[in-house]
Amino acid sequence: MRILGIDPGLQTTGFGVVDVDGHRLRYVASGTVRTTGRATGLALGDLPGRLKVLFDGVSEVAARYQPSTAAVEIIFVNVNPQSTLLLGQARGAALTALVNANLPVAEYTALQMKKAVVGHGRAAKSQVQEMVRRLLELPGLPGTDAADALGLAITHAHAGAAMARVGEVAQLTRRQHAMYKAGRSY
């Protein structure tokens, strides 16, 4: 099974792709989708343009690596409500790209991911990076956004099957995908 992990962000969205064979994990790819800067030519204020870049970037990653499922971080309510709304829009663009690619999507909180990867939910980003490096036998530390995305893929590899059986992971079925694509939600 191939899992695509997504750590959504409006400026930088991390992605990580992991193959799972039984209990063995194999690193495939990781990186980021950036929505501002020279490569995009977009300014911080161009929200619709940045969301399109994010949608297109996640769509391209899904098409290139052909995952069988995806895991996305659930956002938390920030102190700044405006930041939370912007992050929610970025997450929505990423989720829409995954659903458009007909991928089942599992969702995990940062606390769940950190607990699964490091062993406790209050782990620092550097601890997540180091454990992802060790678990996937990487030669160096991945960037923080890519490490979080790889951590989400690892979390789903270890917990997804068992959690799905007891209904703790929200997954979209193929029938639901078809209904959403057709504009129906009954």
From Swiss-Prot:
It is found in: Cytoplasm. GO terms for molecular function: crossover junction DNA endonuclease activity; DNA binding; magnesium ion binding. The active site is at residues 7, 73, 145. Mg(2+) 2 binds at residue 73. It holds the Pfam family RuvC. One of its GO terms (cellular component) is cytoplasm. It catalyses: Endonucleolytic cleavage at a junction such as a reciprocal single-stranded crossover between two homologous DNA duplexes (Holliday junction). Mg(2+) 1 binds at residues 7, 145. It is an enzyme of class 3 (hydrolase). Its EC number is 3.1.21.10. InterPro entries: RNaseH-like_sf (IPR012337), RNaseH_sf (IPR036397), X-over_junc_endoDNase_Mg_BS (IPR020563), X-over_junc_endoDNase_RuvC (IPR002176). Its cofactor is Mg(2+). PANTHER family: CROSSOVER JUNCTION ENDODEOXYRIBONUCLEASE RUVC (PTHR30194:SF3). Homodimer which binds Holliday junction (HJ) DNA. The HJ becomes 2-fold symmetrical on binding to RuvC with unstacked arms; it has a different conformation from HJ DNA in complex with RuvA. In the full resolvosome a probable DNA-RuvA(4)-RuvB(12)-RuvC(2) complex forms which resolves the HJ. The RuvA-RuvB-RuvC complex processes Holliday junction (HJ) DNA during genetic recombination and DNA repair. Endonuclease that resolves HJ intermediates. Cleaves cruciform DNA by making single-stranded nicks across the HJ at symmetrical positions within the homologous arms, yielding a 5'-phosphate and a 3'-hydroxyl group; requires a central core of homology in the junction. The consensus cleavage sequence is 5'-(A/T)TT(C/G)-3'. Cleavage occurs on the 3'-side of the TT dinucleotide at the point of strand exchange. Belongs to the RuvC family. This is Crossover junction endodeoxyribonuclease RuvC. The lineage of its organism: Bacteria, Pseudomonadati, Pseudomonadota, Betaproteobacteria, Burkholderiales. The gene is ruvC.
